[in-house]
């Protein structure tokens, strides 16, 4: 094992750092996976009743079924692979982690590129679209930076940029409970999905991105921004 790989493993070995990442990480992965599966079943199954609170949202995704599936199926695969990418037991095997990393990079590219047309004419209008495009750009930039560093063999910085991309991606999971709160309080606020989806996206992505940045800086890599 080369020196870079050894130092990368040591960097993630302390129990405190492990707890820092796994405590919020697993719930977000579960939420994201559940949301993706729910959307896949909704697209492949019968249409939602017109009285369903999510009927308008389901109809919007159904109108671009192929694009939506091309976006969320790779996203589901990405989410399911993430625990292995973070697991210390897997990271002890450089070949295995290299294969997983390459798969994540390919899946991430598909997710990021398909998110661009998905961001046009969303349910939440220009507010949602602007949040999606901004954070998708940040995701693609972080992913590309991580890929370049990976192929350069600069594994610690590669991991930093990959984790930055992952924090952006998991922002979509944070939006789900926020959207749930908006739906649950509709009888009080009288807000429609077209009015609150953009706000939910801004809140979800921003909170998760800031949390990810805080973790990276507390983690104390040689350089968080190189």
Show where each model-derived region lies.
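Alpha-helical membrane insertion/targeting regions
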Residues: 2-226
């Amino acid at each position: 094992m080369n020196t870079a790989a050894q130092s990368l493993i040591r960097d993630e070995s302390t129990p405190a750092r492990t707890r820092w990442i796994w405590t919020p990480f697993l719930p977000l992965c579960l939420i994201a996976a559940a949301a993706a599966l729910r959307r896949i079943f909704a697209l492949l199954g019968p249409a939602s009743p017109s009285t369903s609170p999510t009927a308008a949202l389901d109809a919007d995704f159904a109108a671009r079924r192929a694009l939506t599936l091309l976006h969320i199926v790779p996203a589901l695969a990405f989410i399911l692979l993430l625990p292995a990418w973070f697991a210390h037991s897997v990271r002890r095997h450089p070949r295995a982690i290299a294969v997983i990393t390459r798969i994540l990079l390919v899946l991430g590219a598909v997710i990021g590129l398909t998110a661009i047309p998905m961001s046009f004419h969303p349910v939440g209008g220009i507010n949602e679209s602007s949040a999606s495009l901004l954070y998708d750009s940040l995701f693609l930039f972080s992913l590309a930076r991580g890929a370049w560093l990976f192929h350069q063999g600069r594994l610690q910085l590669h991991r930093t940029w990959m984790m930055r991309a992952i924090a952006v991606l998991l922002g979509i999971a944070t939006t789900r409970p926020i959207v749930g709160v908006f739906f649950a309080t509709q009888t009080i606020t009288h807000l429609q999905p077209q009015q609150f989806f953009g706000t939910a996206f801004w809140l979800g992505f921003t909170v998760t991105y800031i949390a990810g940045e805080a973790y990276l800086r507390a983690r104390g890599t040689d350089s968080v921004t190189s």
